[in-house]
Amino acid sequence: MLRWMTAGESHGPALLATIEGVPSGLHVTTEDLRRGLARRRLGYGRGARQKFEADEVSILAGVRHGVTTGAPVAIRIGNSEWPKWETVMSADPVDPSAFLIDAGTGDEREIARNRPLTRPRPGHADLPGMLSYDVPEARPILERASARETAARVALGVLAEALLEQVAGVRLVSHVVSVGAERATTSSTPTPADEAALCEASMRTLDPEDNARFEAAVDAAKQAGDTIGGVAEVIAYDVPIGLGTHVTARERLDARLAAALMSIQSVKGVEIGDGFAQSALLGSAAHDEIVRGADGHLTRTSNHAGGIEGGTSNGAPIIARAAFKPISTVPHALRSVDLATGEEAVGLHQRSDTCQVVPGAVIAEAEVALVLADALSDHAGGRSVGEMRRNLEAYLAVVGERA
Protein backbone atom coordinates (compact mmCIF):
# COMPACT_ATOMS: atom_id res chain seq x y z
CA MET A 1 0.00 0.00 0.00
CA LEU A 2 1.17 3.49 -0.85
CA ARG A 3 0.52 6.44 1.44
CA TRP A 4 1.33 9.99 0.53
CA MET A 5 0.78 13.53 1.69
CA THR A 6 1.87 17.07 0.91
CA ALA A 7 2.60 20.11 3.05
CA GLY A 8 3.36 23.75 2.43
CA GLU A 9 1.78 27.04 1.45
CA SER A 10 1.57 28.85 -1.85
CA HIS A 11 4.00 31.59 -0.77
CA GLY A 12 5.86 29.61 1.87
CA PRO A 13 9.53 28.63 1.61
CA ALA A 14 8.78 25.25 0.03
CA LEU A 15 6.29 22.52 -0.71
CA LEU A 16 6.98 19.09 0.74
CA ALA A 17 5.78 15.71 -0.49
CA THR A 18 6.28 12.32 1.12
CA ILE A 19 5.27 8.88 -0.06
CA GLU A 20 5.55 5.62 1.87
CA GLY A 21 5.45 2.12 0.43
CA VAL A 22 7.56 2.69 -2.67
CA PRO A 23 9.56 -0.52 -3.26
CA SER A 24 13.33 -0.60 -3.49
CA GLY A 25 14.89 -0.76 -6.92
CA LEU A 26 12.75 1.87 -8.63
CA HIS A 27 14.82 4.06 -10.95
CA VAL A 28 14.06 7.77 -10.51
CA THR A 29 16.20 10.90 -10.49
CA THR A 30 15.89 14.57 -9.65
CA GLU A 31 15.91 15.28 -13.38
CA ASP A 32 12.82 13.08 -13.79
CA LEU A 33 11.06 15.26 -11.23
CA ARG A 34 12.21 18.44 -12.97
CA ARG A 35 10.80 17.23 -16.28
CA GLY A 36 7.52 16.28 -14.64
CA LEU A 37 7.17 19.67 -12.95
CA ALA A 38 8.07 21.46 -16.18
CA ARG A 39 5.05 19.84 -17.86
CA ARG A 40 2.81 21.39 -15.20
CA ARG A 41 4.07 24.87 -16.08
CA LEU A 42 3.07 24.62 -19.75
CA GLY A 43 -0.10 25.83 -21.37
CA TYR A 44 -1.81 28.76 -23.03
CA GLY A 45 -3.59 31.12 -20.66
CA ARG A 46 -1.18 30.79 -17.74
CA GLY A 47 -0.63 33.74 -15.42
CA ALA A 48 2.46 35.86 -14.77
CA ARG A 49 3.54 33.70 -11.84
CA GLN A 50 4.72 30.94 -14.19
CA LYS A 51 7.18 33.34 -15.82
CA PHE A 52 9.19 34.24 -12.73
CA GLU A 53 8.62 31.45 -10.21
CA ALA A 54 10.82 28.37 -10.55
CA ASP A 55 10.33 24.88 -9.10
CA GLU A 56 13.56 24.20 -7.18
CA VAL A 57 13.12 20.47 -6.62
CA SER A 58 15.30 18.17 -4.55
CA ILE A 59 14.97 14.63 -3.19
CA LEU A 60 15.56 14.60 0.55
CA ALA A 61 15.20 10.91 1.39
CA GLY A 62 14.41 7.46 0.06
CA VAL A 63 16.54 7.54 -3.10
CA ARG A 64 20.25 6.75 -3.43
CA HIS A 65 22.19 7.08 -6.67
CA GLY A 66 18.98 7.23 -8.70
CA VAL A 67 17.39 4.15 -7.14
CA THR A 68 14.78 4.00 -4.38
CA THR A 69 15.83 2.28 -1.16
CA GLY A 70 12.41 1.17 0.08
CA ALA A 71 12.32 3.89 2.73
CA PRO A 72 9.79 6.74 2.54
CA VAL A 73 10.63 9.17 -0.25
CA ALA A 74 10.64 12.87 0.66
CA ILE A 75 10.68 15.66 -1.91
CA ARG A 76 11.15 19.40 -1.47
CA ILE A 77 10.06 22.00 -4.03
CA GLY A 78 11.55 25.35 -3.07
CA ASN A 79 9.81 28.66 -3.76
CA SER A 80 12.15 30.98 -5.65
CA GLU A 81 9.96 33.94 -4.59
CA TRP A 82 10.34 33.20 -0.87
CA PRO A 83 12.60 36.22 -0.08
CA LYS A 84 9.68 38.51 -0.97
CA TRP A 85 7.36 36.67 1.41
CA GLU A 86 9.52 35.59 4.34
CA THR A 87 8.19 38.32 6.62
CA VAL A 88 4.51 37.93 5.72
CA MET A 89 4.68 34.12 5.83
CA SER A 90 7.11 33.74 8.72
CA ALA A 91 6.39 30.75 10.94
CA ASP A 92 7.53 32.72 13.99
CA PRO A 93 5.97 35.87 15.44
CA VAL A 94 6.95 39.07 13.64
CA ASP A 95 7.27 42.56 15.06
CA PRO A 96 4.53 44.65 13.39
CA SER A 97 7.11 47.29 12.54
CA ALA A 98 8.74 44.76 10.21
CA PHE A 99 5.79 45.11 7.88
CA LEU A 100 6.67 48.75 7.31
CA ILE A 101 9.94 47.73 5.70
CA ASP A 102 10.00 47.06 1.96
CA ALA A 103 11.04 43.64 0.67
CA GLY A 104 14.02 44.86 -1.26
CA THR A 105 11.81 46.22 -4.01
CA GLY A 106 12.23 49.88 -3.19
CA ASP A 107 8.53 50.29 -2.45
CA GLU A 108 5.96 49.28 0.13
CA ARG A 109 4.78 46.02 -1.42
CA GLU A 110 5.46 44.22 1.83
CA ILE A 111 2.74 46.31 3.47
CA ALA A 112 0.26 45.34 0.75
CA ARG A 113 1.18 41.69 1.06
CA ASN A 114 0.38 41.69 4.74
CA ARG A 115 -2.88 43.63 4.49
CA PRO A 116 -5.68 41.50 6.01
CA LEU A 117 -7.66 39.70 3.30
CA THR A 118 -11.17 40.11 4.67
CA ARG A 119 -13.14 40.09 1.39
CA PRO A 120 -13.64 36.39 0.57
CA ARG A 121 -13.65 35.40 -3.10
CA PRO A 122 -16.69 33.55 -4.46
CA GLY A 123 -15.72 30.07 -5.62
CA HIS A 124 -12.68 29.83 -3.34
CA ALA A 125 -12.14 28.23 0.03
CA ASP A 126 -11.94 31.70 1.62
CA LEU A 127 -15.33 32.08 3.31
CA PRO A 128 -15.97 28.50 4.49
CA GLY A 129 -12.33 28.24 5.54
CA MET A 130 -12.36 31.46 7.55
CA LEU A 131 -15.51 30.40 9.37
CA SER A 132 -14.58 26.75 9.83
CA TYR A 133 -11.06 27.44 11.12
CA ASP A 134 -12.07 30.59 13.03
CA VAL A 135 -9.53 32.94 11.48
CA PRO A 136 -10.13 36.66 10.88
CA GLU A 137 -8.81 36.79 7.32
CA ALA A 138 -8.32 34.56 4.30
CA ARG A 139 -4.51 34.43 4.11
CA PRO A 140 -4.13 31.22 6.19
CA ILE A 141 -6.83 29.59 4.06
CA LEU A 142 -5.89 30.61 0.55
CA GLU A 143 -2.20 29.83 1.06
CA ARG A 144 -2.96 26.13 1.54
CA ALA A 145 -6.00 25.94 -0.73
CA SER A 146 -4.00 27.34 -3.65
CA ALA A 147 -3.42 25.13 -6.69
CA ARG A 148 0.29 25.73 -6.14
CA GLU A 149 0.05 22.66 -3.87
CA THR A 150 -0.48 20.49 -6.94
CA ALA A 151 3.21 20.84 -7.82
CA ALA A 152 3.89 18.46 -4.94
CA ARG A 153 1.28 16.03 -6.27
CA VAL A 154 2.80 16.12 -9.74
CA ALA A 155 6.18 15.25 -8.21
CA LEU A 156 4.59 12.27 -6.45
CA GLY A 157 2.95 11.35 -9.74
CA VAL A 158 6.38 11.04 -11.36
CA LEU A 159 7.22 8.32 -8.83
CA ALA A 160 3.87 6.63 -9.37
CA GLU A 161 4.27 6.57 -13.15
CA ALA A 162 7.78 5.15 -12.77
CA LEU A 163 6.41 2.38 -10.54
CA LEU A 164 3.62 1.54 -12.97
CA GLU A 165 5.91 1.39 -15.98
CA GLN A 166 8.85 -0.40 -14.37
CA VAL A 167 6.72 -3.06 -12.67
CA ALA A 168 3.79 -3.55 -15.04
CA GLY A 169 4.55 -1.72 -18.29
CA VAL A 170 1.64 0.66 -17.67
CA ARG A 171 1.97 4.07 -19.31
CA LEU A 172 -0.26 7.13 -19.14
CA VAL A 173 -1.04 10.13 -21.32
CA SER A 174 -3.24 13.18 -20.81
CA HIS A 175 -4.74 15.75 -23.15
CA VAL A 176 -7.35 18.51 -23.35
CA VAL A 177 -10.70 17.59 -24.91
CA SER A 178 -12.60 20.86 -24.44
CA VAL A 179 -12.17 24.50 -23.46
CA GLY A 180 -15.33 26.36 -22.58
CA ALA A 181 -17.93 25.46 -25.20
CA GLU A 182 -15.28 24.41 -27.72
CA ARG A 183 -14.85 20.66 -28.00
CA ALA A 184 -12.17 18.64 -29.78
CA THR A 185 -13.32 17.46 -33.20
CA THR A 186 -10.58 14.94 -33.89
CA SER A 187 -11.37 11.29 -33.22
CA SER A 188 -7.74 10.30 -32.70
CA THR A 189 -6.80 9.21 -29.19
CA PRO A 190 -3.26 10.03 -28.04
CA THR A 191 -0.82 7.43 -26.79
CA PRO A 192 2.25 7.88 -24.57
CA ALA A 193 4.31 8.11 -27.77
CA ASP A 194 2.59 11.44 -28.47
CA GLU A 195 3.84 13.09 -25.26
CA ALA A 196 6.43 15.29 -26.97
CA ALA A 197 3.87 16.55 -29.49
CA LEU A 198 1.35 17.23 -26.73
CA CYS A 199 3.91 19.24 -24.76
CA GLU A 200 4.71 21.30 -27.85
CA ALA A 201 1.03 22.13 -28.43
CA SER A 202 -0.01 25.19 -26.42
CA MET A 203 -3.39 23.61 -25.53
CA ARG A 204 -2.12 20.03 -25.14
CA THR A 205 -4.01 18.61 -28.10
CA LEU A 206 -2.78 16.80 -31.22
CA ASP A 207 -5.08 18.53 -33.71
CA PRO A 208 -3.82 21.98 -34.86
CA GLU A 209 -7.36 23.18 -35.62
CA ASP A 210 -8.60 22.18 -32.18
CA ASN A 211 -5.57 23.88 -30.67
CA ALA A 212 -6.33 27.13 -32.52
CA ARG A 213 -9.99 27.10 -31.47
CA PHE A 214 -9.03 26.45 -27.85
CA GLU A 215 -6.54 29.33 -27.92
CA ALA A 216 -9.19 31.63 -29.37
CA ALA A 217 -11.59 30.71 -26.56
CA VAL A 218 -8.93 31.57 -23.98
CA ASP A 219 -8.15 34.86 -25.73
CA ALA A 220 -11.83 35.83 -25.77
CA ALA A 221 -12.15 35.15 -22.05
CA LYS A 222 -9.02 37.15 -21.24
CA GLN A 223 -10.13 40.12 -23.34
CA ALA A 224 -13.45 40.08 -21.51
CA GLY A 225 -11.68 40.19 -18.13
CA ASP A 226 -12.88 36.67 -17.39
CA THR A 227 -11.67 33.10 -16.97
CA ILE A 228 -12.57 29.86 -18.73
CA GLY A 229 -12.53 26.16 -17.84
CA GLY A 230 -12.47 22.90 -19.76
CA VAL A 231 -12.16 19.13 -19.66
CA ALA A 232 -8.99 17.03 -19.51
CA GLU A 233 -8.77 13.32 -20.28
CA VAL A 234 -6.29 10.78 -18.91
CA ILE A 235 -5.71 7.40 -20.55
CA ALA A 236 -3.77 4.56 -18.92
CA TYR A 237 -2.58 1.82 -21.28
CA ASP A 238 -1.75 -1.82 -20.53
CA VAL A 239 -3.32 -1.81 -17.07
CA PRO A 240 -3.48 -5.45 -15.89
CA ILE A 241 -6.89 -6.91 -15.27
CA GLY A 242 -7.92 -7.12 -11.62
CA LEU A 243 -6.76 -3.86 -10.03
CA GLY A 244 -9.31 -2.64 -7.52
CA THR A 245 -12.18 -4.76 -6.21
CA HIS A 246 -15.94 -5.12 -6.05
CA VAL A 247 -15.78 -6.21 -2.40
CA THR A 248 -15.70 -2.89 -0.54
CA ALA A 249 -16.96 0.51 -1.63
CA ARG A 250 -13.82 2.43 -0.72
CA GLU A 251 -11.55 0.07 -2.68
CA ARG A 252 -13.51 0.23 -5.93
CA LEU A 253 -11.05 1.52 -8.52
CA ASP A 254 -13.45 3.95 -10.17
CA ALA A 255 -14.45 5.37 -6.78
CA ARG A 256 -10.79 5.92 -5.90
CA LEU A 257 -10.11 7.59 -9.24
CA ALA A 258 -13.14 9.84 -8.90
CA ALA A 259 -12.11 10.91 -5.40
CA ALA A 260 -8.54 11.61 -6.51
CA LEU A 261 -9.60 13.69 -9.48
CA MET A 262 -12.23 15.58 -7.50
CA SER A 263 -9.51 16.52 -4.99
CA ILE A 264 -7.85 18.73 -7.62
CA GLN A 265 -8.62 22.41 -7.20
CA SER A 266 -11.34 23.59 -9.66
CA VAL A 267 -12.50 20.09 -10.64
CA LYS A 268 -16.29 19.87 -10.38
CA GLY A 269 -17.04 16.72 -12.35
CA VAL A 270 -15.48 13.35 -13.17
CA GLU A 271 -16.46 10.59 -15.57
CA ILE A 272 -15.01 7.18 -16.37
CA GLY A 273 -15.30 5.84 -19.91
CA ASP A 274 -18.39 7.19 -21.67
CA GLY A 275 -19.57 8.53 -18.33
CA PHE A 276 -22.66 10.71 -18.52
CA ALA A 277 -23.13 9.96 -22.23
CA GLN A 278 -23.55 6.28 -21.35
CA SER A 279 -26.73 7.13 -19.45
CA ALA A 280 -28.40 8.10 -22.72
CA LEU A 281 -27.76 4.70 -24.33
CA LEU A 282 -29.87 1.57 -24.18
CA GLY A 283 -28.33 -1.29 -22.26
CA SER A 284 -27.74 -3.28 -25.43
CA ALA A 285 -25.49 -0.50 -26.74
CA ALA A 286 -23.90 0.66 -23.49
CA HIS A 287 -21.80 -2.35 -22.54
CA ASP A 288 -18.63 -3.92 -23.92
CA GLU A 289 -19.25 -7.39 -25.30
CA ILE A 290 -16.72 -10.12 -24.53
CA VAL A 291 -15.34 -12.05 -27.50
CA ARG A 292 -12.46 -14.39 -28.24
CA GLY A 293 -9.64 -12.53 -29.97
CA ALA A 294 -7.42 -13.75 -32.79
CA ASP A 295 -4.79 -14.78 -30.24
CA GLY A 296 -7.30 -16.94 -28.40
CA HIS A 297 -7.57 -14.62 -25.40
CA LEU A 298 -10.68 -12.74 -24.35
CA THR A 299 -11.11 -9.18 -25.57
CA ARG A 300 -13.81 -6.51 -25.91
CA THR A 301 -15.62 -5.08 -28.91
CA SER A 302 -15.67 -1.57 -27.38
CA ASN A 303 -14.61 0.35 -24.27
CA HIS A 304 -17.68 2.24 -23.05
CA ALA A 305 -16.75 1.30 -19.47
CA GLY A 306 -13.40 3.05 -19.70
CA GLY A 307 -11.47 -0.02 -18.57
CA ILE A 308 -13.30 -0.53 -15.27
CA GLU A 309 -16.20 -2.87 -14.47
CA GLY A 310 -17.49 -3.62 -10.99
CA GLY A 311 -14.83 -1.40 -9.46
CA THR A 312 -12.07 -3.50 -11.07
CA SER A 313 -9.82 -2.94 -14.09
CA ASN A 314 -10.87 -5.20 -16.97
CA GLY A 315 -7.71 -5.04 -19.07
CA ALA A 316 -8.88 -2.32 -21.46
CA PRO A 317 -7.33 1.16 -21.37
CA ILE A 318 -8.58 3.15 -18.39
CA ILE A 319 -10.12 6.45 -19.48
CA ALA A 320 -10.98 9.19 -16.99
CA ARG A 321 -12.02 12.80 -17.53
CA ALA A 322 -12.05 15.76 -15.18
CA ALA A 323 -14.14 18.89 -15.71
CA PHE A 324 -12.43 22.08 -14.53
CA LYS A 325 -14.64 25.04 -13.67
CA PRO A 326 -13.38 28.50 -14.68
CA ILE A 327 -10.79 29.79 -12.21
CA SER A 328 -12.47 31.60 -9.33
CA THR A 329 -10.04 34.53 -9.24
CA VAL A 330 -11.82 36.57 -11.89
CA PRO A 331 -10.21 39.86 -12.99
CA HIS A 332 -13.73 41.29 -13.21
CA ALA A 333 -14.12 40.89 -9.46
CA LEU A 334 -17.32 39.30 -8.15
CA ARG A 335 -19.49 40.65 -5.37
CA SER A 336 -18.64 39.77 -1.78
CA VAL A 337 -18.90 41.13 1.76
CA ASP A 338 -16.02 42.50 3.83
CA LEU A 339 -16.13 40.39 6.98
CA ALA A 340 -14.21 43.05 8.92
CA THR A 341 -16.76 45.80 8.28
CA GLY A 342 -19.89 43.93 7.20
CA GLU A 343 -20.13 46.15 4.14
CA GLU A 344 -20.72 45.05 0.57
CA ALA A 345 -17.51 44.76 -1.42
CA VAL A 346 -15.89 42.87 -4.26
CA GLY A 347 -13.77 39.77 -3.76
CA LEU A 348 -10.06 40.36 -3.47
CA HIS A 349 -8.10 39.73 -6.65
CA GLN A 350 -4.64 38.26 -7.01
CA ARG A 351 -2.79 37.32 -10.19
CA SER A 352 -4.12 34.13 -11.70
CA ASP A 353 -4.37 32.10 -14.88
CA THR A 354 -7.07 32.72 -17.47
CA CYS A 355 -7.33 28.98 -18.15
CA GLN A 356 -5.88 26.12 -16.12
CA VAL A 357 -7.01 23.10 -18.12
CA VAL A 358 -3.58 22.37 -19.67
CA PRO A 359 -1.73 22.06 -16.34
CA GLY A 360 -4.94 20.50 -15.05
CA ALA A 361 -4.45 17.63 -17.49
CA VAL A 362 -0.93 17.00 -16.15
CA ILE A 363 -2.17 17.14 -12.55
CA ALA A 364 -5.03 14.76 -13.38
CA GLU A 365 -2.52 12.36 -14.92
CA ALA A 366 -0.50 12.42 -11.69
CA GLU A 367 -3.60 11.67 -9.61
CA VAL A 368 -4.61 8.75 -11.84
CA ALA A 369 -1.06 7.41 -11.66
CA LEU A 370 -1.04 7.55 -7.86
CA VAL A 371 -4.32 5.65 -7.60
CA LEU A 372 -3.23 2.99 -10.11
CA ALA A 373 0.18 2.60 -8.48
CA ASP A 374 -1.50 2.15 -5.11
CA ALA A 375 -3.89 -0.44 -6.57
CA LEU A 376 -0.97 -2.26 -8.21
CA SER A 377 0.87 -2.27 -4.90
CA ASP A 378 -2.20 -3.74 -3.21
CA HIS A 379 -2.41 -6.53 -5.79
CA ALA A 380 1.23 -7.35 -6.45
CA GLY A 381 2.93 -5.80 -3.45
CA GLY A 382 6.51 -6.50 -2.51
CA ARG A 383 9.48 -4.83 -0.91
CA SER A 384 11.35 -4.53 -4.18
CA VAL A 385 10.53 -3.87 -7.81
CA GLY A 386 11.79 -7.37 -8.62
CA GLU A 387 9.46 -8.98 -6.09
CA MET A 388 6.50 -6.99 -7.42
CA ARG A 389 7.29 -8.08 -10.98
CA ARG A 390 7.47 -11.73 -9.96
CA ASN A 391 4.18 -11.48 -8.08
CA LEU A 392 2.47 -9.82 -11.03
CA GLU A 393 3.88 -12.28 -13.56
CA ALA A 394 2.67 -15.24 -11.50
CA TYR A 395 -0.81 -13.75 -11.22
CA LEU A 396 -1.01 -12.90 -14.94
CA ALA A 397 0.13 -16.42 -15.86
CA VAL A 398 -2.87 -17.84 -14.03
CA VAL A 399 -5.20 -15.26 -15.60
CA GLY A 400 -3.81 -16.07 -19.04
CA GLU A 401 -4.76 -19.72 -18.64
CA ARG A 402 -8.40 -18.75 -18.12
CA ALA A 403 -8.85 -15.67 -20.26
Task: Please report, for each region that a protein language model flagged, where it lies by residue.
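Generic N-terminal targeting/processing segments that precede catalytic cores or assembly contacts
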Residues: M1-A403
